[in-house]
Amino acid sequence: MNSLLMITACFFLIGTVWAKEGYLVNKSTGCKYGCLLLGKNEGCDKECKAKNQGGSYGYCYAFGCWCEGLPESTPTYPLPNKSCSKK
């Protein structure tokens, strides 16, 4: 019984330690933040680490800014009920 309790506690802790990751999204258009220089990208890293995003690291992946270490409150692509509109 104690083993089951310990395993459950470990799964709970792992879930709270892992941070969110994903493509940065423009809330008004629903589109990903674009980039051209794949891999390490100063622009993506700066955007991800901005105060309003709260990420720990960003890089260019598949021509979009991918962020790691985001808080759960930061929206990522795709936004629910909003498709990318380039207007």
Swiss-Prot record:
<keyword id="KW-1015">Disulfide bond</keyword>
<dbReference type="InterPro" id="IPR044062">
    <property type="entry name" value="LCN-type_CS_alpha_beta_dom"/>
</dbReference>
<keyword id="KW-0872">Ion channel impairing toxin</keyword>
<dbReference type="InterPro" id="IPR036574">
    <property type="entry name" value="Scorpion_toxin-like_sf"/>
</dbReference>
<feature type="disulfide bond">
    <location>
        <begin position="44"/>
        <end position="65"/>
    </location>
</feature>
<dbReference type="InterPro" id="IPR018218">
    <property type="entry name" value="Scorpion_toxinL"/>
</dbReference>
<dbReference type="InterPro" id="IPR002061">
    <property type="entry name" value="Scorpion_toxinL/defensin"/>
</dbReference>
<feature type="disulfide bond">
    <location>
        <begin position="31"/>
        <end position="84"/>
    </location>
</feature>
<feature type="disulfide bond">
    <location>
        <begin position="35"/>
        <end position="60"/>
    </location>
</feature>
<protein>
    <recommendedName>
        <fullName>Toxin Css39.8</fullName>
    </recommendedName>
</protein>
<keyword id="KW-0165">Cleavage on pair of basic residues</keyword>
<feature type="signal peptide">
    <location>
        <begin position="1"/>
        <end position="19"/>
    </location>
</feature>
<dbReference type="GO" id="GO:0006952">
    <property type="term" value="P:defense response"/>
</dbReference>
<keyword id="KW-0528">Neurotoxin</keyword>
<comment type="similarity">
    <text>Belongs to the long (4 C-C) scorpion toxin superfamily. Sodium channel inhibitor family. Beta subfamily.</text>
</comment>
<dbReference type="InterPro" id="IPR003614">
    <property type="entry name" value="Scorpion_toxin-like"/>
</dbReference>
<dbReference type="GO" id="GO:0019871">
    <property type="term" value="F:sodium channel inhibitor activity"/>
</dbReference>
<dbReference type="GO" id="GO:0005576">
    <property type="term" value="C:extracellular region"/>
</dbReference>
<keyword id="KW-0738">Voltage-gated sodium channel impairing toxin</keyword>
<dbReference type="Pfam" id="PF00537">
    <property type="entry name" value="Toxin_3"/>
</dbReference>
<feature type="domain" description="LCN-type CS-alpha/beta">
    <location>
        <begin position="20"/>
        <end position="85"/>
    </location>
</feature>
<feature type="disulfide bond">
    <location>
        <begin position="48"/>
        <end position="67"/>
    </location>
</feature>
<dbReference type="GO" id="GO:0090729">
    <property type="term" value="F:toxin activity"/>
</dbReference>
<comment type="function">
    <text>Beta toxins bind voltage-independently at site-4 of sodium channels (Nav) and shift the voltage of activation toward more negative potentials thereby affecting sodium channel activation and promoting spontaneous and repetitive firing. This toxin is lethal to crustaceans (freshwater crayfish (Cambarellus montezumae spp.)), it provokes a reversible paralysis to insects (crickets (Achaeta spp.)), but is not toxic to mice. At high concentrations, it does displace the (beta) mammal-specific toxin Cn2 from rat brain synaptosomes.</text>
</comment>
<keyword id="KW-0964">Secreted</keyword>
<keyword id="KW-0800">Toxin</keyword>
<keyword id="KW-0732">Signal</keyword>
